[in-house]
Amino acid sequence: VVAEAAPTRLNPSVKWSVLIFQHMRRIEKYDCLPDMNSQYCSKHIAPHWLMRFFGAESATFQLAGKGLQVVTKNDDRYLILAESLANDGTFQEGTLFARLVLQTNTGPKTFSGLRKKDAQALFWWLREHWLRQLAPEVAKTAEDIRALLTQGYPRQSRLEVARAMAQQALARFVRVPEPEWCADVRDVPFKWVAVVAGWQDDDLEKLRQSYVTCQLQRYADFFTAVESQPLTERQREACVVDEDNNLVLAGAGTGKTSVMVGRAGYLIESGQAHASEILMLAFANKAAAEMQKRIDRRLGKCGITASTFHKLGKEIIARVEGQQPSLTPLAEDDKALALQVNQWFEEHLKTPAYQQLIIKYFQHHLYPAANPFDFESEGQYFDYILANDIRTLKGEAVKSLGECLVANYLFKQGIEYKYEPAYEHRTASPLYRQYQPDFYLPEHGIYVEYYGVDREGNTAPYVDREKYHQSMAWKRQLHAEKGTRLIELYHYELQEGGLFDAIDAQLAALNVEYQPLPPEAVLATLREFGAIRGFSTLLADLLKRYRANCYEKGQVEAAIANASNPEQVDAALSLLQPILNDYQALLDREGQIDFDDMIGKAVQYVREGRFRSPWRYILVDEFQDISEARARLVQYLRDAAKDCSLFCVGDDWQAIYRFTGSDLSFTTAFREKFGSTKITALDLTFRFNSGISDVATRFVLQNPVQVNKPLNTLDKVKHPTVSLLREDNRPRQNSDGPSRLEKVISRIADIAEPGSSVYLLGRYGFNLPDRRELQRLAVRYPSITLECHTVHASKGKEADYVVVLGLETGKFGFPTGKTTHPLLEALLPPLEGYPHAEERRLLYVALTRARCRVYLIADMAVASDFVVELLKGQYEIDLNEFSTSLSQHLLHMLKCMKCETGTMVPRQSQFGLFFGCNKFPLCAHKERGCERCESQMRRAGRFKICINPDCFNWVPVCPQCGAEMVQRNGRHGEFWGCKNYRHEGECCRHTENEIIFDQNLLILESA
């Protein structure tokens, strides 16, 4: 952007959008100037005769095709560089004579001893002819830059090309020529090119902002009328900005569909695109249909078509292959696909090679390897065991991967074993349970212990080293005393790869001979407990996941290398590959494709150039849900069309479909993935109030990976609009009071406007009331409308009120403790480092479905970690809308003392109610409830105190063994004795005459 006397940098006070259109038009064509390249011009100069005696030489200067060159008397030729003619220091005047110092392609060249008049005339001649030669080129460059920058929004790619063109031209003339250098040459193009060459990033941003301002003013009426409500300032800006790649971060309720419609309409209204040049993409048929309906209603039958990715892929395939592809029935019938995969699997199991592969997999690679020493607590290690459901080839649940490998090896070698049987001699006492060795080999009378120690004798961080070694010593002594045979195995042997050698050596020393089971026998055992059928189902899932990724060359190897357990993944894929071949052969034989082919083949055809993209503008809805394969297709389509712009609308806070292959990194790292990018955040939600927004936004932003974007609300409130009901979920006998859910629904019916909508949302479908219960509630509360949805199904919907159910901890809790199979995990996008990242976003989605108010229901005995976080973080939630018992106030603080991560939950046995760790049987810790009221008891110093405020019963704990102390009568009166006391045998004999209870312990921390 340049005026007649243009500065070298943009002046921020100038309206650059005006100047760029005014002054570019002033660039003139230089048709009147001679074409210097078509003429041969030369000028000879000789030094003063006197100076020739001192070595001064004559030369001829020529204007040739390559530019100005000088030819010396000796026929040496040099090309004169532009800086020589732009630099006033080239002509140097002395007392008697002058000289020219010219920069050439071989270095400086000096011509001295020249008459001043001759030297000056030559310099001006060189400069004039140089400018005459350059002027048309510079004018052409200026015109090309003008044409480039008047195509529309100043995209980074266009600006970089323009700046490169200008810098290349500037290198030819170095500086803007002065008017007296050549009267026939105008300096405007030179100035314009010099300014463009010197543009900085802030100059470019001002240029873009000026363009946006002009467009917003020009199309203000369009943006006011294109939707039922005028677009907001940010929505309009998002429609106008047309960078090479555009990301619109549209928070919940901010009107992303309005932006999609407004963007498409603006491109047509402004003449930047025809309808046939615009591609609009959605993920689901329903979403595409709704988008199409909205476009037709707001823009008329303009010719824009909203398509799904699969429909797009199918059209690309049809254009390349000349016919519409046929869809395999298996693509729409998961049960039929699973049956077909099972049939192929069973056929392969008949071959010896495949039998060996499957047995090796089950023996060594069925579970992901994990070192117990890498976990911080026993509870975390138990989480790993529970999540992977570690079982032997015989189907037994075991407590460690090492034990599983030992059992599998013994089984495969034909050695009968029993897992954790009671020792043949009685060892139980009031202090200790009966000893149960890890394994017993009944045919040989041999016990096996697998010790969790490293080579230095260290234990895992959460295991008391001294007590563990005492236990090891006690076991050795016991076997020695009773004369029973024991072999000992160690964790470090597994880590060092010598575990099976150790088993072989010790059993051989005891004269145990192996009788390896034939593969058929091993497979038969695996069938007995459903392992073969389960693996067949897994193969069907792996087949779908593998094909959905549409791998290109090298990507499979990368997926294996990046997996947390590469050997396990590699072993599984070797079993999957024959199934993949069978499936592809079936498709080829039938001449059919599946949904994954619609993406994969389209990617291939666009990449290879077999499909020519007609689209200059690609608009993608719900971009946070995009997979790597779909992102690849979008990138190839963008690169296949000249000046194609990518426009993506999504919200990283609502990315909840990783399990289908969605990769959030394409949103959070959009610029790194796609290149030059403009990010616009829609900052105003029309759905929920500030109370919901404050809680939901703060909650989701605990994950630092989420983009921190502003989100304002139209409805400002001064009181909490997220409420928590804390109530015991245990069924009570003879209790006919309302359920927790009905209490909330009754409350909503009392405060809501008639006709208000209420969503009941659950992490899983079984969290929700069944159809009969929902009908009963609907009849009882006719003033409100009730609907049930899983949180995933509620995405994109909204209601006046939302009730979130299933906020519990555990495998099917919220956040879910259920883990993705490690093999499927390896084929999914990389797992985020932040704990429960996607589950956190899922709760954000649940919260932001509500317009007026959200209700959370939880039992604090098994409360979700998210509920505990809301309480501990002192979020602005209403805790007083419903009455809450003191036990519910305290329960979330009562964790299992042994494993530290488990929660003590009520259980019933033949002896009555007790509280046990929810990680049982891995963690067997249990405690009695209060003898008076059956409520849970909390630990405070050496006391157990009932959490029931109407009871507050207390019991002292034995400092020797940890059992409860009870009052007894003796010869000298009452005393306190340990509950583990017995008159004979091993027991605890600790007694105390007096125990004083500290009443200050009743002052509860949570009060």
Locations of regions flagged by a protein language model:
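C-terminal accessory regions
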Residues: 808-888, 909, 913
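Conserved RecA-like helicase ATPase core segment
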Residues: 471, 476-477, 631-720
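Phosphoinositide-dependent membrane-docking surfaces
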Residues: 68-70, 76-95
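P-loop NTPase Walker
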Residues: 16, 57, 106-112, 138-327, ...
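Helicase P-loop NTPase motor core
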Residues: 257-260, 375, 387, 676-678, ...
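Conserved helicase NTPase motor core
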Residues: 177-181, 187, 194-252, 257-261, ...
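A short beta-strand element within the Helicase C-terminal
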Residues: 789-818
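Conserved P-loop NTPase-based nucleic-acid remodeling module centered on helicase motor cores
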Residues: 277, 282-285, 289-362, 477-537, ...
